[in-house]
């Protein structure tokens, strides 16, 4: 029998209070925690309480405002500048600076439909676009 197997057998023989004490001592000794890792940006779904049973999950908020981000102008920079001017009402110099300074937001806080339309126009002109 290996050391690991004998340790497992010893742990199996412990009661709940002894297991809690073992956990605390391991956390103190090695500076670790037995807590479950927390997922970033709310990726983990909320879990219903054990005794509750009828607890509903929190409703997921649907995003209503989107940003259109120009990642790169692509080979047709002049066409992209024209589309940026059309979408933003910027002057020629400002639109050129925006396109050359990519990645930059072209439209911010717009509806999904407006964001999709802007992305379609920019992509048609040869730009690489992302909606956030």
UniProtKB/Swiss-Prot annotation:
A single Gene Ontology CC annotation of this entry is: cytosolic large ribosomal subunit
Query: Keyword rRNA-binding: yes or no?
Result: no
Which family does the similarity line name?
Answer: Belongs to the bacterial ribosomal protein bL12 family.
Give a short account of what the protein does: Forms part of the ribosomal stalk which helps the ribosome interact with GTP-bound translation factors. Is thus essential for accurate translation.
Q: Which NCBIfam families match?
A: L12
Q: Which GO terms describe its molecular function?
A: mRNA binding; structural constituent of ribosome
Which taxonomic lineage is given here?
A: Bacteria, Bacillati, Chloroflexota, Chloroflexia, Chloroflexales
What name does UniProt use for this protein?
Answer: Large ribosomal subunit protein bL12
- CDD domains per the record? Ribosomal_L7_L12
Q: Which UniProt keywords apply?
A: Ribonucleoprotein, Ribosomal protein
Q: Which organism is it from?
A: Chloroflexus aurantiacus (strain ATCC 29366 / DSM 635 / J-10-fl)
Show the PANTHER family listed in the entry. 39S RIBOSOMAL PROTEIN L12, LARGE RIBOSOMAL SUBUNIT PROTEIN BL12M
Q: Which domain of life is it from?
A: Bacteria
Matching SUPFAM superfamilies: ClpS-like, Ribosomal protein L7/12, oligomerisation (N-terminal) domain
- A single GO BP annotation from the record? translation
Kindly state the subunit structure of this protein.
Homodimer. Part of the ribosomal stalk of the 50S ribosomal subunit. Forms a multimeric L10(L12)X complex, where L10 forms an elongated spine to which 2 to 4 L12 dimers bind in a sequential fashion. Binds GTP-bound translation factors.
Question: Which cysteines does the record link by disulfide bonds?
Answer: none
Q: Does the keyword Ribonucleoprotein apply?
A: yes
């Amino acid at each position: 029998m290996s050391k690991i197997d004998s340790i497992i057998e010893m742990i199996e023989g412990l009661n709940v209070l002894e297991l809690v004490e073992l956990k605390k001592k391991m956390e103190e000794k090695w500076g670790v925690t037995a807590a479950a890792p927390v997922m970033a940006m709310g990726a983990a779904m909320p879990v219903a309480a054990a005794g509750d049973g009828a607890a509903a999950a929190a409703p997921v908020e649907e995003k209503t405002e989107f940003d259109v981000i120009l990642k790169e102008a692509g080979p047709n920079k002049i066409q992209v500048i024209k589309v940026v001017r059309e979408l933003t009402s910027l002057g020629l110099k400002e639109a050129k600076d925006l396109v050359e300074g990519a990645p930059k937001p072209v439209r911010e806080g717009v509806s999904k439909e407006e964001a999709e339309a802007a992305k379609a126009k920019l992509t048609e002109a040869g730009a690489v676009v992302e909606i956030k």
